[in-house]
């Protein structure tokens, strides 16, 4: 779905939810690390992401969602592709992803949406992530 379109667009009788998120990487003591988040509502480990606001570009959505969920202000480094799946409400969802680098830590505050963050090695992330689609995304950007 093109940037700047409505969050969800009717395609016949199917509504596709548009979202964006980030794979945030840094150099750590054990090499390259990536940030994963725990969502208590689903009891899952994934990458930070969320639905786009109407009129919001995918890039702006990804940066906003990462900031809201993690407290990190980031720089987009490169596009990381797209994942498509059916969400918990049964709607088709398309998520555009970017590799990001943290610039500033605005402070994480655990909340109902994300209650824990972990910086983990790429190998540990592959074991911790709940969804195969996230592991496949991680493999594409190694």
Language-model regions: role of each:
Residues 27-33, 89-91:
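Short, solvent-exposed loop/turn segments that connect beta-strands within catalytic domains
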Residues 42-44:
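A short, flexible beta-alpha/helix-coil linker loop
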